[in-house]
Amino acid sequence: MQVLKTIEELQNIRKNSLGKVGLVPTMGALHNGHISLIKQARNENDIVIVSIFVNPTQFLPGEDLDAYPRRDEADKKICQMCKVNYVFMPEISTMYTKEEVLVKAPNKSYILEGKTRPGHFDGVLQVVLKLFNLTQPTNAYFGKKDAQQLTLIQQMVKNFFLPINIVPCDIVREEDGLALSSRNIYLNPTQRKDALLISKSLYMAGSLISSGERSVKAVKDKIYEVMSILDVEYVAIVDKEFNELETIEPTNTIILVVARFGNTRLLDNIWL
């Protein structure tokens, strides 16, 4: 495994790479969710590149950029264990200049996550496009937990005619159902226990729909009821292009939940 720090190193490697290339973009602090993406990429490609870069442009003022967990040495060991070929770990000054041509996310980026974090998805798309241009992957792997981000990246690839296959990967959970997140380490024991109500509410919603419930309001009300002790930021029921639904479509629905635990935001969802 080789660790790359510069654009020149990465471009030279890519220029001489043959076969399928899989990219797994991350911000580090790798956990079993990331490992599942990396292992899938390893199974489906000749060369696997993992990027580790805490992207400043997707953080808003007052968010946890400086506090975001950084575990570079541990992350490199995980990548080596997963038989990654190249780890790209650039500095901010490598990825950004003072004058930048900007990527503007579409209107759907200003709902849900984007409503709470305006401009967040502009930064996400900016860095992902840079990584795509640098690595020119055959396949790029993203988790379904960040469902709105995944949908916007798919749209960017389509709009910019990028010859890249976006691979959506299932959410990985702890044994008790909590969706894996690098931010879970911020939770105290009480918050960690209460956070289980998020996945519990989603499982319950899925069960209701499996039993024939099609009312968006009825399902939302039940979710809020299960999470009544939590600081719920939003509950949304949308189709897979993030249009609001009047009636639940069992094979074309995503149910999303975000709750706050102090300064920590946790998001989760289920895809039907």
Curated annotation (Swiss-Prot):
Pathway: Cofactor biosynthesis; (R)-pantothenate biosynthesis; (R)-pantothenate from (R)-pantoate and beta-alanine: step 1/1. InterPro entries: Cyt_trans-like, Pantoate_ligase, Pantoate_ligase_C, Rossmann-like_a/b/a_fold. Coiled coil: none annotated. Beta-alanine binds at residue 58. GO terms for biological process: pantothenate biosynthetic process. Gene3D superfamilies: HUPs, Pantoate-beta-alanine ligase, C-terminal domain. (R)-pantoate binds at residues 58, 149. It is found in: Cytoplasm. The active site is at 34 (proton donor). It catalyses: (R)-pantoate + beta-alanine + ATP = (R)-pantothenate + AMP + diphosphate + H(+). GO terms for cellular component: cytosol. ATP binds at residues 27-34, 143-146, 172, 180-183. One of its GO terms (molecular function) is ATP binding. Transmembrane segments: none annotated. Keywords: ATP-binding, Cytoplasm, Ligase, Nucleotide-binding, Pantothenate biosynthesis. Pfam families: Pantoate_ligase. Its main location: cytoplasm. Its EC number is 6.3.2.1. Catalyzes the condensation of pantoate with beta-alanine in an ATP-dependent reaction via a pantoyl-adenylate intermediate. The reaction proceeds by a bi uni uni bi ping pong mechanism. Belongs to the pantothenate synthetase family. Homodimer. HAMAP family: PanC. This is Pantothenate synthetase. It comes from Aliarcobacter butzleri (strain RM4018) (Arcobacter butzleri).
